[in-house]
Structure formats: structure tokens, C-alpha cells
């Protein structure tokens, strides 16, 4: 079996979930499972968190997959339906749909079945949702729909709740607080960062995404600073070790030049596994025997290279790419990206090992 694998720690997942429930109070947290639970395995996460009151996914395909697992927990579609006929599936499977534009509102008007819906408001993200110029008309149309359309509440999304300066997030919250809602409508505003940074935005429901998987929702630090534990650890092995003299080159296009006499390791990791060819720059670390070493040269389809300098390790030595001992956030920053991209990028051929079951 190929050495590259991701290890999913269910004990860490349960720990994070317990923390989220406590930090979300008085709200109830939704579990965000989009993109295969941020690469952690939607099936595994959903079955482990069997006390969750709500799941949130991007699209109807993800929601149907949950139902096929026998999971009957309420599910909300964060992008709503893409076609009018998907409302029939929402009714059949008992999904909640988000409504973020007038096209979707028209589909609801024409729908003869029964469905639960949430109204999405663009409070300043300027991505999805009814804008401030549209919101009055959106509410008027929502209130005019027959009782078969069961409005659950209103949702928005913060653009900058993960930053030190919360000015924009607070402006968005003030925008939402000006809305006059029916008494039974619920409010779902806070994402992972806002669960920590904006307790005044908790209201009825929060949405726990990246923090559920043990990673910091902020632009700095790592999850451990907030009591979180990484759920995913990705490891591989050294396949070969070569000694290079100073200025000797290695890899495609002679992409690496040895800065001095030393050792170069080849590891089982490539863009065929989902590891982007552009990630290695000499700044991205891996962890071997507790020491950090840089990825160098060009990532190939199945292999990458690590400069060991004067150190030497045997073939078969474990290499941690990110996770329990090498923070995913640190690797992401070095790669010029965010942790979400690292956990979601890995391809199906990467073996998965579940621990803590």
C-alpha cells in the first residue's frame, strides 16, 4: 500500500464539537459538512456527531448523500436549489433550502409542495443574498407565499470576522439587527470565527465549519490557541535518499540546486494526490523526527523532494506533511494559502485511516 495517507482522529473531532457547543451558547451550532466535511469525510463526521441538531451542505447532491446513509437530521442547502425541480427533492428528503435571489423566490411561488426555507441577506459580503436595496421586496414576497412554504429564518455571512479589525463584521451585524423579523423566524449569522469573536452574533444558530476540524478560523495562530485539536494528520514516507554536492541539481527542469553538500530525500507525495505543483518554494516545511525540513524543487505527479542538509534518514522514515505535530495553519501560510485548501485538496487515492473510533 502506498505510504501517503490521511489520519482522521475522531477523539479530536468529538473534543472540538464539545467545545463548539459550549462556545456557541445560547445558540445551537449547525455542523457544516460541505466539500466532504472539508476533506475529512462527510460520512465519518456525520455519523460521529449523531447528536447534531442541524447539518449544512453546499448543494442538494451532498444532502442526498446524507439521506442515503440513513441520516435523518435536518439539512440546510447553503446555496439553495439550482433548478426549480430540485424543490421536489427538498420536499421528498425534507431538506431546508436557502433562498438568495428572486429567481429562487419565483420557483417557490410556483411550487405546489411543502418545503422549509431560509432567507439569505447580503449584509456586506456581496456574494450571495438579497442586497439592502432588495431586502424589502424580498421580505414582501416571502410573506406573500402560501403556508406550504415554511420560513425558518434568516441567514447571513460575515466577510471579515476572522480578522483582528471587526469593524466590518460589526457593521454587518448592525445591518442584520435592523431587520424586523416575524416572531418565529430564527437567526443564523455566526460562522466559526464569529463563534469566538462575536458572541453577540450567536442568536439562535451558529455554523461551525473549519473550527470543527480543529483549525483556527482566524488569519493568525493555530487551533491549539483556542483549545481546538486537529482532526486530520497527513503523513507519508521517505522513498529514497541521495547525497548531492554543492550546486548539484535534482528534479524536473533541475528545479533544485543544492546550496551545500548534503542529503536530499524523495517522498511519496505528488500533484496526482492533490498536492499542488506550485506549493513547494523552499519555504513549505515537513516534519521528520521532530525537525522541520523544506520541500524543494518541483512537485511531480507521485513524488516530491525534501532537503535534509547534513541530516540523513533511512528509507521508510515517516514524514508528517501537516496535522497533529506540524500545524496545518503553519504549512498553509508558508504555501501562501489557507488551511481549508490543504484539507480539501487530497485526492481519493490517498488512503484514509480512522482512529479514535
Swiss-Prot record:
Keyword Isomerase in annotation: yes
Residues at which substrate binds: 127, 301
Record field: catalytic activity: L-alanine = D-alanine
Domain of life: Bacteria
Active-site residues, Swiss-Prot/TrEMBL: 34 (proton acceptor), 252 (proton acceptor)
EC number: 5.1.1.1
UniProt GO molecular function: alanine racemase activity; pyridoxal phosphate binding
Entry's Gene Ontology cellular component terms: cytosol
CDD domains: PLPDE_III_AR_proteobact
GO biological process: D-alanine biosynthetic process
Keyword Metal-binding: no
Group of enzyme by EC: isomerase
Cofactor: pyridoxal 5'-phosphate
Residues bearing PTM N6-(pyridoxal phosphate)lysine: 34
Matches recorded under InterPro entries: Ala_racemase (IPR000821), Ala_racemase/Decarboxylase_C (IPR009006), Ala_racemase_C (IPR011079), Ala_racemase_N (IPR001608), Ala_racemase_pyridoxalP-BS (IPR020622), PLP-binding_barrel (IPR029066)
Pathway: Amino-acid biosynthesis; D-alanine biosynthesis; D-alanine from L-alanine: step 1/1
UniProt family annotation: Belongs to the alanine racemase family.
Function: Catalyzes the interconversion of L-alanine and D-alanine. May also act on other amino acids.
HAMAP family recorded: Ala_racemase
Protein name per UniProt: Alanine racemase
Organism field: Dichelobacter nodosus (strain VCS1703A)
Organism phylogeny: Bacteria, Pseudomonadati, Pseudomonadota, Gammaproteobacteria, Cardiobacteriales
Amino acid at each position: 500500500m502506498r505510504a501517503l495517507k490521511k489520519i482522521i482522529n475522531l477523539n479530536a473531532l468529538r473534543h472540538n464539537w464539545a467545545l463548539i457547543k459550549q462556545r456557541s451558547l445560547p445558540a445551537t451550532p449547525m455542523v457544516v459538512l460541505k466539500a466532504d466535511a472539508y476533506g475529512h469525510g462527510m460520512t465519518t463526521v456525520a455519523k460521529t456527531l449523531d447528536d447534531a441538531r442541524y447539518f449544512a451542505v453546499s448543494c442538494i447532491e451532498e444532502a442526498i448523500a446524507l439521506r442515503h446513509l440513513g441520516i435523518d437530521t435536518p439539512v440546510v442547502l447553503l446555496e439553495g436549489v439550482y433548478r426549480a425541480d430540485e424543490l421536489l427533492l427538498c420536499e421528498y428528503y425534507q431538506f431546508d433550502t436557502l433562498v438568495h435571489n428572486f429567481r429562487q423566490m419565483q420557483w417557490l411561488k410556483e411550487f405546489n409542495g411543502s418545503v422549509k426555507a431560509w432567507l439569505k441577506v447580503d449584509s456586506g459580503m456581496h456574494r450571495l443574498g438579497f442586497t439592502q436595496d432588495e431586502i424589502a421586496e424580498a421580505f414582501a414576497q416571502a410573506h406573500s407565499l402560501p403556508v406550504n412554504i415554511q420560513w425558518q429564518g434568516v441567514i447571513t455571512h460575515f466577510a471579515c470576522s476572522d480578522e483582528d479589525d471587526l469593524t466590518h463584521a460589526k457593521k454587518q451585524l448592525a445591518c442584520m439587527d435592523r431587520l424586523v423579523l416575524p416572531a418565529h423566524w430564527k437567526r443564523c449569522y455566526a460562522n466559526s470565527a464569529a463563534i469566538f469573536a462575536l458572541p453577540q452574533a450567536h442568536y439562535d444558530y451558529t455554523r461551525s465549519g473549519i473550527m470543527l476540524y480543529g483549525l483556527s478560523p482566524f488569519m493568525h495562530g493555530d487551533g491549539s490557541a483556542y483549545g481546538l485539536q486537529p482532526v486530520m494528520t497527513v503523513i507519508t514516507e521517505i522513498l529514497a535518499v541521495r547525497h548531492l554536492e554543492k550546486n548539484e541539481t535534482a528534479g524536473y527542469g533541475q528545479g533544485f540546486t543544492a546550496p551545500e553538500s548534503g542529503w536530499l530525500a524523495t517522498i511519496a507525495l505528488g500533484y496526482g494526490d492533490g498536492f499542488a505543483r506550485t506549493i513547494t518554494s523552499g519555504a513549505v516545511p515537513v516534519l521528520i523526527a521532530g525537525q522541520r525540513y523544506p520541500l524543494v524543487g518541483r512537485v511531480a505527479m507521485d513524488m516530491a523532494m525534501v532537503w535534509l542538509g547534513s541530516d540523513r534518514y533511512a528509507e521508510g522514515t515517516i514524514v508528517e506533511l501537516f496535522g497533529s505535530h506540524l500545524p496545518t495553519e503553519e504549512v498553509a501560510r508558508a504555501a501562501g494559502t489557507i488551511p481549508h485548501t490543504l484539507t480539501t485538496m487530497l485526492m481519493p487515492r490517498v488512503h484514509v485511516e480512522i482512529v479514535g473510533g
